[in-house]
């Protein structure tokens, strides 16, 4: 199932939904001010989704100034609070999945003990939660995929998984997108799709940067990766990426039929 980020005006969102049938990944509850005005934001956004004709929803969780593995208990507690508020928004709006960043900053945080502390945070966060909403952890500035895979391995909860952002992997990491995929594929539940030329996080349409279409196609072939979000900031870029990704996905289905014959 394809989704696209709510980075357009609502009227443009409506047009894209009508043309493609895609769902929406909302950033509305990643913003602290909106979480501070939770009830008002929830009511307002629910109405906006209705006007857009959105029938399928994912949420992107908060991340600015937060750190799940902070040694400062106050910061950790605020992170837990903000994550919980976004989770409750997902529950109220019927979202099926919520994306959280690792919040890792290279050269500032050590990776020694990082996976253990992150797993401890999410075990606490997921305590007594069911699997009606999937939680996926997304790479951003992360340079290597192994620590994220270690976190997923340590968390024994059916709702937890990983989100591979191929654009972030392409520009912030020297490890290839293919290696990111191979390292994380056992735990992948979601995909963020956009392109760049490897120099900055430019969120270009698929096929206009340096990310291999064959790699994207290979990821789409994984049965557990049932959802992906197109993260571009213009209507034209979103539509170009959607039709490009759809073609890759349809090639997947053709290949599967040929294998069965």
Language-model segments: residues:
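A short acidic, helix-capping loop that chelates divalent metal ions and anchors anionic groups
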Residues: 65-70, 105-111, 171-172, 198-204
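Acidic (Asp/Glu)-rich catalytic clusters
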Residues: 12-21, 39-59, 85-94, 126-130, ...
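Active-site acidic/histidine proton-transfer and metal-coordination neighborhood
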Residues: 68-161
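Active-site beta-loop-alpha junctions enriched in small/polar residues
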Residues: 7-9, 27-31, 62-64, 103-105, ...
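N-terminal pre-domain/capping segments
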Residues: 1-85, 146, 255-261
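Hydrophobic faces of well-ordered beta-strands that scaffold small-molecule active sites
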Residues: 1-6, 22-26, 57-60, 98-100, ...
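Histidine-acidic metal/acid-base catalytic patches
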Residues: 15-16, 145-160, 170-261
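Charged helix-capping and loop-helix junction motifs
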Residues: 38-44, 75-83, 113-120, 149, ...
